[in-house]
Amino acid sequence: MNLKKNKVINITEVCGFERAIDKKKYPAGSCYIKLSAVDEFVGQIKEEGEIDSRYCVFIPKEGINTDYLFIAVSRSFPKFLCRYRTTINLQIDVVSKFELDWHEEKEAQSYIVKAMKQIQREIELTEAQIEREKNQKKYYLGNLFPDMK
């Protein structure tokens, strides 16, 4: 497995894309980005479902690791946005120029997905710990001078 062996590919090599259509069911693992009032947010649906029409949907081709696709799109989208956004909206035809850094090896993709999931778990644990400590601080400060209530 060689993690440094990646190449730049066009989004159309790994998935199709379209402006989301109302009431259309999209497959699990599809990624989406905003076209209206666009920001750097990239979403992914975990189960088959509908997506609002203000989004562009990336529908993965057969055999594509959808978790890896989400990571690749998330990492490449801010750079693409800086280059191609001309107003607060993004034009659907410009999305065809979207390029991804892509690892061809399935083993490398699986390794990256596993590593990113572990990092995300650590982030969530740390955020939960911070929240618990904030609540603990609030409790202790609230009870610091009990006679002053």
Predicted regions and their residues:
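Hydrophobic structural patches
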Residues: I112-I123
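Structural motif
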Residues: G29-C31
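Alpha-helical membrane-embedding segments
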Residues: T87-L90, E124-A128
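A common structural junction motif
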Residues: F77-F80, R121
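Proline-centric
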Residues: N2-N6, C56-G63, K79-F80, L90-K114, ...
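Non-catalytic DNA-recognition/assembly elements of restriction-modification systems
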Residues: M1-A20, P27, E104-E107, L125, ...
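A short beta-sheet element
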Residues: K34-S76, R85, Q91, V95
